[in-house]
Structure formats: C-alpha cells, structure tokens
C-alpha cells in the first residue's frame, strides 16, 4: 500500500490473540454467583447488580437523554433489550465493560458521549480508538446515525492505508474540525506527533475491543502515547467481549477507580439465539462440504472465516467460479477497496463474505445469520468473536465450524471448556431453517 511510511499498519498476522486464561465473573453483591442475564458491576464503590435495560425509546427516556438523541433512537427502531449499563456511563465515571458480542456496547459509548458533548468549533472532545479500519468506519457511522438531530456535532474517522494529507486537510479547517474523532492508534498517533490533532480538550477517551489494542505491544505503545496527550481529567471507557484476568490490570492503569461491568458469567459468554455446530472432515473435503452448505442452507448473508489472506483469495475465487456472489475482506486488500467491499456487503449487494480475523471483531452487519469457520481459529476467544457476527443483538443465527486436524479438535475442546457448552455435530439431515432464520 502507498503512504505506509507514515503509519503503523496492523496485519492479520499481528491480530493473533494471545492465549488468555479463562476468566471468572465478579460475584453479585450478596456473594452469590451472578445468574445468566444478570449485570454485575464492581468497583471502588459498593458492588452493584442490575439486570436488563430496555432499549425501547421509553427505556432510554428513563436515562434523561437529550431529546435529539431520543428522536434518533426512535428512528433507528431499537426494539431489543440490552444488558449493557448506560446509566453507569452517563454518571461520568470510568467504565471497564465486558459484554458478549452483539449486546450494544457501541451504543453505550456513542449515546453517552453524544449526551455529554457540548460541541465547541475547532475542538476535539471525544476520542474513540479501535484496532481495525472497518470497525473505525462502522463506529463513525453509528455516531452519524445517532447525531442526525445534532447538526453542530462533527465526526471524523482517521485510519491507516489512506493518504495522511487528507486527514491533515480536515484538521486544518476549523469548519470541518471534528468534535468526535474515531480511528486506529497508528494513524492517530502520527497525527498527534505531527501536531495536526490536538487532544488537549478531550473529555472522553474510549477504547473499543480494548484487549486487542492493549495485548499487542506496538499498539499499546501508540495508545499510551495518545493517552498522555489528553488531559488528566477525563472519562475513560473500555469495552470488549473478552477480558482476560491478565489484561484487566493493564486496562485499569488508564483509569481512576473504574466501575467494572460484566454482563453474564464470563464462562458463559455464549450468544443467545445462536445455534452452534461442528463438522468433522478432511482438508480436501472442505470445498465440497462448503458448496453443499451454501446450496442447501437458507441464509440472508454468510461470513466464512479462513486463517490467511492467501486462503481468503483462493476460496473467494473458487466461490465466484461456482457462481456464488462472494467478496473477500482481509489485510492484503487496499484500504479503499476494503471499505468499498465492506459497504457492498453491508448494503446487501453481496451475500457471501470470505474473511480473515481482521473482520472477526465488532463488525456489525445485521443481516448476517450464518457464520462458517472454514478454518477453525487458534483459540476460544477468537471463536466467540467470529461466530458473534451471526446472531447480533440477540437475534437468531447459525454457526458451523469445520474440524479437520488434531489442533482443531483441541481448540474445539477448549471452546467447550471455556464457555461450558457442548457443541453438537451438525446433523446429517441438516437444520430446520425456521430455527435460525428470523
């Protein structure tokens, strides 16, 4: 890619997760284990336990959100309950939140920061960082959705793989200077170092999928440098679907007396409404089996995960030769093309996406209801993030994982142990589509 010299780019290989130890949930206030569906909050204050928070606009009204936000929420048609705690964040305390995929973590910080924001022209008040360009682009779009009735709020997204000069032009113009900045650490740090992006007025510092950024030394270094460029007096919020015991102390170093919010028992971070199966087969049988599944299963959109960019390209080519309308998304594709393909898939112009783990976290495409692990991931947490692409926000979905080696069988056992579930073998007669089609 061009313009790589001025940024740190993160490839799929660098996105390999570290082997995280299984975590356990914080106990409820009365000392009893938190039940499934409970929200457990721990922190410097006395422990609190809440439960489901309504996502109807009437539920949001209880939080005393701005009227402009309530109108946008109504327009978005939110109907499902969310277990993630919005009132906690609105109290302007630091928050460390773990909640499984699809439970509306993004909405928590987007709504909280928009509610608290008093935009000043030419000042950045909110900084949101995430580890991939696609996720940054998506978060920026969420801000656009919810700020539609807040015309004075300006949002911009900055990430690697695009000319940095375009970002500098946005930041050089007071009319376009963003109040909310979303981006990846490498590009943001380059802009801060060049003194093009001033963070001296930041009031909210947010890390989405925080464990991914703080797990990797290079990315953590960028985050730390950016953090040091912000004021001491600010709210820090961090979110992820997986927070190991090892990463939590690292997160807390950025915070002051944070409230820790854990939705559901850590070991039971399964996805309600998502059916999960595996198929044992040899490597040479994968293509035929995939073809059969795509022919016989009903689905709105499917995401197929592979372990490398080369395999993504090869499988995408094969699918298109078999007349399946697919696209491939991975770090080997230019940034402009990746965003173009992401939009094609998001807008339902393509129904099949072949992807590496670069697409495995946080990406929210509501029509995906089938996830296939053509190659099983290396660890249980990556599995959770991948299959979480189907069955977002408590909707129905189906995931099927190919198991073709001893290593795969070991990962399968780790998944079952980590999340205390028994994954059944995919039935010979298939699955009734009414059980996973909304």
From Swiss-Prot:
A motif (DEAD box) lies at residues 208-211. Residues 23-42 are annotated as: Disordered. ATP-binding RNA helicase involved in transcription elongation and required for the export of mRNA out of the nucleus. SUB2 also plays a role in pre-mRNA splicing and spliceosome assembly. May be involved in rDNA and telomeric silencing, and maintenance of genome integrity. The Q motif is unique to and characteristic of the DEAD box family of RNA helicases and controls ATP binding and hydrolysis. GO terms for molecular function: ATP binding; ATP hydrolysis activity; RNA binding; RNA helicase activity. Its EC number is 3.6.4.13. The keyword Nucleus applies. Keywords: ATP-binding, Helicase, Hydrolase, mRNA processing, mRNA splicing, mRNA transport, Nucleotide-binding, Nucleus, RNA-binding, Spliceosome, Transport. The gene is sub2. This is ATP-dependent RNA helicase sub2. Residues 289-434 form the Helicase C-terminal domain. Residues 23-36 have a biased composition (Low complexity). Pfam families: DEAD (PF00270), Helicase_C (PF00271). A motif (Q motif) lies at residues 58-86. Residues 86-261 form the Helicase ATP-binding domain. It catalyses: ATP + H2O = ADP + phosphate + H(+). Its main location: nucleus. It comes from the Eukaryota.
